[in-house]
Amino acid sequence: MSVQLTPHFGNVQAHYDLSDDFFRLFLDPTQTYSCAYFERDDMTLQEAQIAKIDLALGKLNLEPGMTLLDIGCGWGATMRRAIEKYDVNVVGLTLSENQAGHVQKMFDQMDTPRSRRVLLEGWEKFDEPVDRIVSIGAFEHFGHQRYHHFFEVTHRTLPADGKMLLHTIVRPTFKEGREKGLTLTHELVHFTKFILAEIFPGGWLPSIPTVHEYAEKVGFRVTAVQSLQLHYARTLDMWATALEANKDQAIAIQSQTVYDRYMKYLTGCAKLFRQGYTDVDQFTLEK
């Protein structure tokens, strides 16, 4: 039976189309809105974000002239880096109008013979062959019911030697949680409800076995998994510190309510990563 899937435009735009100026108050200059990788302890946030992008792209065996699909491309930092470092063609997918506009301007200013496109659409509608796929911090938005379709689409899009790098926040299974001594507290339940209602509507965190199960079901092999758990705690700490330092501007751009909401989100999530209630992993998938 054919299933017609419509991308979650509303859920994504509710978060990412808040205001580019607001996000600039706490993100680094590349506007990378995902876990950084502090390869060295003395790295700035910007250096650590580029290190994370390099870590992801370095797992894809990119070669000049290949076409890289970036699913959930954000403000385009990964595609820019891929063009500059690996000399590839890029296609970015985003459901955010603000992000699509920002990326298009960036592309227009780049001096490269490589093709570069940003599409205001989801992976659900994408049907072009590409050589490699990267997806950083987008899988969390898809919802459990779409996992099978996501892996089907990405597997079909790639060639026989294709690779995908999937970077996503994950949660422990109940068994893993018990083994770690994690308990389900009222505080955790309330914070989770807050995140799903006010920050990432429609969001859902997979477990590591879930990613394996759905990826392998369509023919992918998961050849590597790398955790960046404490790197995300540090990233969130730095975002919260930057937002707090720009409190007056944040309130002027948005409101006291939005500022308070984001401080609660950033500090609360940092705590979850430190305690092990959440993790973030890079999965290398091969056909």
Swiss-Prot record:
The modification Phosphothreonine is found at residues 168, 183. Its main location: cytoplasm. One of its GO terms (molecular function) is cyclopropane-fatty-acyl-phospholipid synthase activity. Pfam families: CMAS. The active site is at residue 269. It catalyses: a 1-acyl-2-(9Z)-enoyl-sn-glycero-3-phospholipid + S-adenosyl-L-methionine = a 1-acyl-2-(9-cyclopronane)-acyl-sn-glycero-3-phospholipid + S-adenosyl-L-homocysteine + H(+). GO terms for biological process: lipid biosynthetic process; methylation; mycolic acid biosynthetic process; S-adenosylmethionine metabolic process; symbiont-mediated evasion of host immune response; symbiont-mediated perturbation of host innate immune response. Belongs to the CFA/CMAS family. This is Cyclopropane mycolic acid synthase 3. It comes from Mycobacterium tuberculosis (strain ATCC 25618 / H37Rv).
